[in-house]
A protein has these predicted regions:
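Nucleotide/phosphate-binding catalytic cleft detector across ATP-hydrolyzing
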Residues: 1-92, 100-218, 224-270
C-alpha cells in the first residue's frame, strides 16, 4: 500500500504520484520547476521528513516546504497563526489525529496519535460482531457512523436498520441499531483523543493555555464531523470547542496557503 495509517510507506510510488500532480498542474510540456509544500503528521521523524523531501525533489520540485498537519489545518481554518497568542487545533483525519497548540507560526506543544476516523469504523465493526454476532463491512460501519453515530448522548435517540451476516447461522440477518449503541462502540476511541487533548493542554505554557481557554479549541478533519465530539471535548476539558467551517478541506487549503504565509513572514523580517 502507498499509505499505512495515513503515513507514506512506499516512496517510489509517492514520487510518481507527486510527479503526476506536478504535470497535471503545470502541463507536461512545462520546463518550470515548482515550489511544492507537503503536509505531514506532527509525529513524523526527521528521517521521514527527509524521505518526503527527497521524493518530492526527485519528482521535479524546485524547492520543498514541509508543513505539519496542525499548522496547515489552522491556516485552512482561517486562524492567523503568526500572532503571539495560543491557538489549539485538533485535526482528526482517517488514520491519525494531530493535536497542537500553535503560536508565532509554529507548534509549541503537539502530539500525533494513531486513533482517528478509520478507528471509528473499525470500532463499530467490532461492536456489531461482539454484541450482535453480526458481521458487517467497513462501508456499512461508515454508513452507521454517518447516519446515527455519536460519542455523546443525543436528546432524541435514533435508530437504523443494519444488514449483515449472522456469525452463528451464516445467513443474512437484519437488526435495528440505536445511536446509544454507537456511543458505546465509539467510547474507547474518542476518549483516547480526549486524553491526547488533555496531555497537550497539560504541557502548554500557562499564558498560551489561558489563550486557548479564551479562544476555544478548533476541530478539523473528516473525523471531527462525528456527532457529539465537540460536546465531549468541551465537557472533559471545560473549554469551548467548535468545528471549523469546512473541516474536511482545512489541511489541503492550509498546505496550499503555507507558501504565502512564509512569504509574508519573510517580508515582515525585512
Amino acid at each position: 500500500d502507498l499509505y499505512k495509517r495515513q503515513v507514506i510507506s512506499d516512496y517510489t510510488v509517492t514520487e510518481k504520484m507527486i510527479k503526476h500532480f506536478i504535470q497535471k498542474a503545470l502541463g507536461k510540456k512545462s520546463f518550470r520547476k515548482p515550489l511544492v509544500s507537503v503536509c505531514v503528521p506532527s509525529g513524523v521523524t526527521e528521517v521521514e521528513k527527509k524521505a518526503v523531501e527527497d521524493a518530492t525533489f526527485a519528482a521535479g520540485a524546485r524547492d520543498v516546504k514541509i508543513i505539519e498537519e496542525p499548522i496547515a489545518a489552522a491556516i485552512g481554518a482561517g486562524i492567523d497563526i503568526s500572532k503571539p497568542c495560543g491557538n489549539m487545533i485538533v485535526d482528526i483525519g482517517g488514520g491519525t489525529s494531530d493535536i497542537a497548540v500553535i503560536s508565532l507560526g509554529g507548534s509549541v506543544v503537539s502530539t500525533s496519535i494513531k486513533i482517528a476516523g478509520d478507528d471509528f469504523d473499525e470500532a463499530i465493526v467490532r461492536y456489531m460482531r461482539k454484541k450482535h454476532n453480526l458481521l458487517i463491512g467497513e462501508r456499512t460501519a461508515e454508513d452507521i457512523k454517518i447516519k446515527i453515530g455519536t460519542c455523546y448522548p443525543l436528546a432524541q435517540p435514533e435508530t437504523i436498520e443494519v444488514r449483515g451476516r449472522n456469525l452463528v447461522t451464516g445467513l443474512p440477518r437484519t437488526i435495528t441499531v440505536s445511536s446509544e449503541e454507537t456511543e458505546e462502540a465509539l467510547r474507547e476511541a474518542t476518549l483516547q483523543i480526549v486524553e491526547a487533548v488533555h496531555s497537550v493542554l497539560e504541557k502548554t505554557p500557562p499564558e498560551l493555555a489561558a489563550d486557548v481557554a479564551d479562544r476555544g479549541i478548533v476541530l478539523t478533519g473528516g473525523g471531527s464531523l462525528l456527532r457529539g465530539l465537540e460536546e465531549l471535548i468541551e465537557e472533559k476539558t471545560g473549554i469551548n470547542t467548535m468545528t471549523a467551517e469546512q473541516p474536511m478541506t482545512c489541511v489541503a487549503i492550509g498546505t496550499g496557503k503555507y507558501v504565502e504565509f512564509l512569504a509574508g513572514k519573510r517580508d515582515e523580517e525585512f
